[in-house]
Amino acid sequence: MALSHSQKEKIVNLLEKKIEDKLRRYARETSSMPFLTRLIQDSEKVAAYSFIHSIATTLGMSIYEDVSKIIAEETSDECFTKYDVGGVISRKQKSTIDNIVRKLRNGEKKAHHEEEVKLLLYASAKDGKAQKEGRIADFYMKREGKEYFFEIKTVKPNIDVFTKSKTKLLEWVARRR
């Protein structure tokens, strides 16, 4: 499905605003880049690199959330960035999640979403408690009565980032059961 003219316009405006804001607020985080300075041997190029890296970071994760919302707005019942999933998690559910993630990390099993969801739904939700951590989805949308929660990550996350993200996704299932 192609983007509508309105969506394209909103995305262009968003990018322009983010870049203009960055240009207005840009302050070099550090002038000490000895390795890069020795490697490139041109302090102006190092400063340019620092600026480009800063722009790339600005246009990084937060921009994906905003663009996701722009794309989804026209075809979903509702959509939000930084959505509070809510709900509670029991000790039994937490134990089930820890077990799934440990087995995946150790290579004892392959990921199988439907099976993991069944295990979580089977785990008792009795005496569930609210948790502060892991409650926020980067992006949420509801379409035709079905809820979708998204955790947006960079390409090729390391194993620790993967583990934390997988845990969070499984916790969302437990919270919304």
Spell out what each predicted region is.
Residues 131, 156-177:
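Acidic, metal/cofactor-coordinating or nucleic-acid-engaging core segments within structured domains
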Residues 83-144:
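Active-site metal-binding core of divalent-cation-utilizing nuclease and nuclease-like domains
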Residues 77, 144, 174:
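Residue-level marker of positions within ordered structural domains that often coincide
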